[in-house]
C-alpha cells in the first residue's frame, strides 16, 4: 500500500530484536518517543542525584543515534503523562518542554513531533496531556512550542550536522540479549553502563554507542 512519497518508520526501541538490522532492511528512517518526565514519576525519587532526573533520557537518545545518526522523534513529550493503569507523571515545568525538545535535537534528531495536539477526554491515554489541555484553549505550552520553533530557526547553520563524540562504548546484540536470561550479566551490564553514563554527564564528555556485527570493519 506504500505510495510515492510515503515512508516507513516505527516509534521505539525493541530489546528482543536487532534494531540496526530492522532499520537497514525495513525502515526509511528510525523514530523514537521521548518522555524525559519518566524520571519524575510517582515511582521515582526526583531528589536522588544518581538518577540525573530528566538528563538521564539522553542515555536512550544515545542508543537511538547508534541505530540512525539522524533520527526523528515521533512523540516528544509536551504535557503530563499517564495511562489509566500506570505511568503517572507530572507536567513539564515552564521551559522544560523546550529543554527536552532541544535535548533531542542536540542528540541528532532532525525531526520533532510533539505528542499531542490536544488532550483526549476518554480512553486509555486520556491522562497523556498534549500541547492543548482538555479545554482546547491556547496556553503556555502552545506559546513554548512556538518559541521552540523560533529558536530552531537560529540553528539553521548546524542543521544536519553529525554528533561528535569523545569516546565510544562497544556493544553487540548477542551479549545484550544474554542479559535477558542471565541475571548476573544483567546486573553487571546495568551497573556498568549506568556508571559510564553518569561519568560522561558529570564531566560533559559526549559518547556514542557502537554495535559490533559480522560486517564491522
What are these regions (language model features)?
Residues 1-6, 35-217:
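Carbohydrate-binding surfaces of carbohydrate-active enzymes
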Residues 10, 30, 168-170:
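Short, well-ordered beta-strand segments
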Residues 11-13, 211:
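Short loop/edge segments at beta-strand edges and connector loops
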Residues 16-25:
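Distinct, well-ordered alpha-helical segments
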Residues 25-30, 108:
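Glycine-enriched alpha-helix->loop->beta-strand junction motifs that scaffold or abut catalytic
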Amino acid at each position: 500500500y506504500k505510495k510515492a512519497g510515503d515512508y516507513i518508520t516505527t516509534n521505539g526501541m525493541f530489546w528482543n530484536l536487532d534494531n540496526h538490522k530492522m532499520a537497514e532492511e525495513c525502515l526509511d528512517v528510525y523514530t523514537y518517543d521521548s518522555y524525559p518526565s519518566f524520571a519524575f514519576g510517582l515511582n521515582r525519587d526526583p531528589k536522588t542525584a544518581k538518577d540525573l532526573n530528566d538528563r538521564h533520557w539522553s542515555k536512550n537518545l544515545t542508543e537511538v543515534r547508534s541505530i540512525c545518526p539522524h533520527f526523528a522523534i515521533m512523540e516528544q513529550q509536551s504535557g503530563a503523562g499517564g495511562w489509566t493503569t500506570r505511568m503517572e507523571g507530572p507536567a513539564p515545568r515552564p521551559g522544560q518542554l523546550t529543554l527536552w525538545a532541544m535535548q533531542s535535537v542536540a542528540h541528532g534528531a532532525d525531526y520533532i513531533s510533539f505528542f499531542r495536539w490536544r488532550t483526549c477526554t476518554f480512553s486509555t491515554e486520556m491522562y497523556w496531556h498534549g500541547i492543548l489541555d482538555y479545554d482546547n484553549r491556547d496556553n503556555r505550552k502552545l506559546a513554548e512550542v512556538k518559541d521552540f520553533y523560533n529558536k530552531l530557526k537560529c540553528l539553521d547553520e548546524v542543521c544536519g550536522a553529525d554528533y561528535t563524540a569523545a569516546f565510544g562504548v562497544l556493544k553487540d546484540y548477542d551479549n545484550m540479549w544474554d542479559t535477558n536470561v542471565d541475571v548476573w550479566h544483567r546486573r553487571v551490564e546495568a551497573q556498568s553502563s549506568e556508571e559510564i553514563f553518569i561519568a560522561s554527564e558529570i564531566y560533559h564528555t559526549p559518547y556514542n554507542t557502537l554495535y559490533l556485527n559480522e560486517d564491522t570493519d
